[in-house]
Regions:
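Phosphate- and other anionic-substrate recognition elements at nucleic-acid/protein interfaces
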Residues: 1-168
Length: 168
């Protein structure tokens, strides 16, 4: 399904072990707000939900977009799966549409541009959205952990998938 609902405010969220990345967009290449929220200590899901509630209050999104953590072969932790369900319940309680895309669907929406993995998708997004260029993390080495900034690009990829693929 191709969503071409430009003008609709979309909050894309990408929860991680360290917190979450988010992007707010009204069209596929025009972000309004973005960033990461670092969450430490116990009660990470509760803290994440509080941050998300603040984002919802600030931006009044028409839709929330998430990665589907239940996709067969997925590697999301049990905590993240619970958090995604809680985010969906929070959105439902505020009459906000929730859209969850499998990682394979996100990758497919960037196929025509030649991007096949997370890093290539992030590079493509940074080229298309100048505001994101300075946040592009360096290519991850096998022995390093993924940069927290990559969650911004994962969230942006989800939002762009919602609006429809970008070409070239």
């Amino acid at each position: 399904m191709n969503h071409t609902r430009h003008g609709e405010t979309v909050l894309a969220l990408y929860p991680t072990t360290r917190g979450l990345g988010f992007v707010v967009m009204r069209s596929p290449l025009s972000p309004i707000d973005w960033g990461t929220r670092d969450i430490r200590g116990s009660g990470k899901n509760t803290q994440c939900l509080e941050k998300i509630a603040t984002l919802i209050d600030a931006h009044q999104p028409d839709a929330i977009v998430l990665e589907d953590p239940t996709t067969p072969g997925g590697t999301r932790s049990t905590r993240i799966k619970r958090l995604v369900r809680a985010i969906a319940a929070l959105a439902d309680s505020q009459a906000i549409d929730v859209h969850a895309f499998a990682r394979s669907r996100v990758v497919k929406s960037f196929e025509a541009s030649g991007a096949k993995n997370r890093q290539e998708i992030a590079v493509l997004i940074a080229k298309r959205v100048p505001a994101f260029e300075r946040f592009l993390p360096p290519k991850r080495r096998l022995w390093t952990t993924e940069s927290a900034r990559m969650s911004i690009f994962c969230a942006a990829a989800l939002a762009i998938t919602f609006f429809g693929p970008i070409e070239g």
